[in-house]
Swiss-Prot record:
Residues 196-242 form the F-box domain. Kelch repeats lie at residues 293-343, 358-396, 397-446, 463-515, 527-579. Self-associates. Interacts (via Kelch repeats) with AD03, CDF1, CDF2 and CDF3. Interacts with GI, ADO1, SKP1A/ASK1, SKP1B/ASK2, SKP1C/ASK3, SKP1D/ASK4, SKP1E/ASK5, SKP1K/ASK11, SKP1N/ASK14, SKP1TA/ASK20A, SKP1TB/ASK20B, APRR1, APRR5, DI19 and COL1. It comes from Arabidopsis thaliana. The gene is ADO2. Residues 35-114 form the PAS domain. GO terms for biological process: flower development; protein ubiquitination; regulation of circadian rhythm; rhythmic process. Belongs to the ADAGIO family. This is Adagio protein 2.
């Protein structure tokens, strides 16, 4: 049986009594975290559905926001392809020359290949005034066939002087409009009383095939379209699918294990991770001791446990002991782990987590110089013991390099300092899942300047981001704030510079102050958080900076949060615990490692700890 569409005119977009004090629909108990004040003012979101089974993808539905912002009534656009928005005025036949043809071609290619498109394009209202349309087109499949395309459109004013728009007489516009409307089938002349094909689908199909494919921000906007979609977007299971598709299965699994996650619900989790409204610093103390005292060790998180290995002791003595801090305990304290066959002592090395409870250490500076060996430790083994991995064709020995893990099985190492003192620019990969692991240098047509003290961060499925470090510039070395990315899913991966397109940073800066030995972590959705490290001048090392490399035009922004941050934070002493807590060890003096004091950055309300 066909479902009568509940049209926007019956939906109260003002929210009425259901609008919470913070301006979000429903507050903590509601389901649509969408700021009412921005609709349709500063950030109006249009919603368009086209029929992929008909030639030229004709529009079959637009929401009220689309009508208000563009000036086109629904009955004027139903049955047309949405490319008319690229023409200045309702009667112009050609695309305006200022519309980026490259973006148009990319969008056409995505539609033809049935893949998702994201981009920003110059569009025009009915009166000819320009506006920027940041849109996302998502193909909807049923039994492996694309049936519809869903478009979520974020409109903003375009500050472009195009001169007077082509005008028509006041009598001409209604006459042509009536002529166009009369050519439509009677059932399509008034969408508010007609039937929309998408609403003939069952709730299950809409939720699983359509809503679950959107981002948290998009689904929040979709919930404002009509009553039926409003009710569907209140379902916590729908939001879980949205978060899983956006953030990945592993991130979703980690969030599910956070204490209180079930109580708080996916709606609020999605909102807090998107807006960072609940992000806050907290200082806490732990028991136990790490003796002998040391610096330049490496820390890594395994679930709720923080592991430190090695470090530089008195008189530059390399250390090779292992300590664990269990933050899941009611009274966390540092404990020494008795392990057999420990690696040679070292500092300036990296310690990373691979599958489950396994840790991998690489390189560093030891008693007899630089190292390039690899050791694995299973923290949950009984008893735990280190095991050397004799990887074939290893990279040259190094220290102060950067590393990360991919897919839980692959170790990636980049840069660092060689025995000669020269800085390195190579990138190597070691697959630890192989029976006989072998190092492989990733061949690239171009490499960023050689550096040490930088960070490698994994985001998306198989992408890595490099930031900062002490980089070589001619015969000199300078702190860097450059950003480079590499997609390892490509047949021929290559480093690509990320250029900042403006920002909200003070003083008109396009990037955070240059630094090395800083902290860089990947947040759900692929955003990168940067802070800490060695920063020159009067710039604060504790200021948080956020970058989304997935954006078409990435731009840095400052993240201001509650609570008192640490004065210092170093990359080798900071780690993400449980996916929702960023723990900084020490951080008050920058020299003495007071490991009984720590700071944590809580990324969501439910992560508040009792320690």
């Amino acid at each position: 049986m066909q479902n009568q569409m509940e049209w926007d005119s019956d939906s109260d977009l003002s929210g009425g009594d259901e609008v919470a004090e913070d301006g979000w629909f429903g507050g903590d108990n509601g389901a649509i975290p969408f700021p009412v004040g921005s609709l349709p003012g500063t950030a109006p979101c249009g919603f368009v559905v086209s029929d992929a089974l008909e030639p030229d993808n004709p529009i079959i539905y637009v929401n009220t926001v689309f009508e208000i912002v563009t000036g086109y009534r629904a009955e004027e656009v139903i049955g047309r392809n949405c490319r008319f928005l690229q023409c200045r005025g309702p009667f112009t036949k050609r695309r305006h020359p200022m519309v980026d043809s490259t973006i148009v071609a990319k969008m056409r290619q995505c539609l033809e290949n049935g893949i998702e498109f994201q981009g920003e394009l110059l569009n025009f209202r009915k009166d000819g005034s320009p506006l920027m349309n940041k849109l996302r087109l998502v193909p909807i499949r049923e039994e492996d066939e694309i049936t519809h395309f869903i478009g979520v459109l974020l409109f903003t004013d375009a500050k472009i002087d195009l001169g007077p728009s082509p005008d028509l007489s006041a009598k001409e516009i209604p006459r042509i409009s009536r002529s166009f409307t009369s050519a439509l089938p009677i059932g399509e002349r008034n969408v508010s009383r007609g039937l929309c094909g998408i609403f003939e689908l069952s709730d299950e199909v809409i939720a699983i095939k359509i809503l679950s494919q959107l981002t948290p921000g998009d689904i929040a906007s979709v919930g404002c379209v009509c009553r039926r979609l409003n009710e569907l977007t209140k379902n916590d299971d729908v939001w879980r699918m949205v978060c899983q598709n956006t953030w990945g299965t592993e991130a979703t699994r980690v969030l599910e294990s956070v204490p209180g996650a079930k109580r708080i619900g996916w709606v609020r989790l999605a909102r807090e991770f998107t807006t960072h409204e609940a992000t806050a610093w907290r200082k806490f103390s732990v028991g136990g001791t790490v003796e002998p005292s040391r610096c330049n060790f490496s820390a890594c998180a395994v679930g709720n446990r923080i592991v430190i290995f090695g470090g530089e002791g008195v008189n530059m003595q390399p250390m090779n002991d292992t300590f664990v801090l269990d933050l899941g305990s009611s009274s966390p304290e540092w404990k020494s782990v008795l392990v057999s066959s420990p690696p040679p002592g070292r500092w300036g090395h990296t310690l990373s987590c691979v599958n489950g409870s396994r840790l991998v250490v690489f390189g560093g500076y030891g008693s007899h110089g630089l190292l390039n060996d690899v050791f694995l430790l299973d923290l949950d083994a009984d008893p735990p013991s280190w095991r050397e991995v004799s990887g074939l064709a290893p990279p040259i020995p190094r220290s102060w390099h950067s590393s990360c893990t991919l897919d839980g099985t692959k170790l990636i190492v980049s840069g660092g300092c060689a025995d000669s003192g020269a800085l390195l620019s190579d990138t190597f990969l070691l697959d630890l899942s192989m029976d006989i692991p072998a190092w492989r240098e990733i061949p690239v047509p171009w490499t960023p300047p050689s550096r040490l003290g930088h960070t490698l961060t994994v985001y998306g499925d198989r992408k890595i981001l490099m930031f900062g470090g002490l980089a070589k510039n001619g015969t000199l070395r300078f702190r860097s704030n450059d950003v480079y990315t590499m997609d390892l899913s490509e047949d021929e991966p290559s480093w690509r510079p990320v250029i900042g397109y403006g920002s909200s940073l003070p003083g008109g800066m396009a990037a955070p102050p240059p630094r090395l030995d800083h902290v860089a972590i990947s947040l759900p959705g692929g955003r990168i958080l940067i802070f800490g490290g060695s920063v020159a001048g009067l710039d604060s090392a504790s200021q948080l900076y956020l970058l989304d490399p997935n954006e078409e035009k990435p731009a840095w922004r400052i993240l201001n949060v509650q609570g008192g941050p640490p004065r210092f934070a170093w990359g080798h002493t900071t780690c993400v615990v449980g996916g929702t807590r960023l723990v900084v060890l020490g951080g008050q003096t920058g020299e003495e490692w007071m490991l009984n004091e720590a700071h944590e950055l809580l990324l969501a309300t439910s992560t508040t700890a009792s320690t």
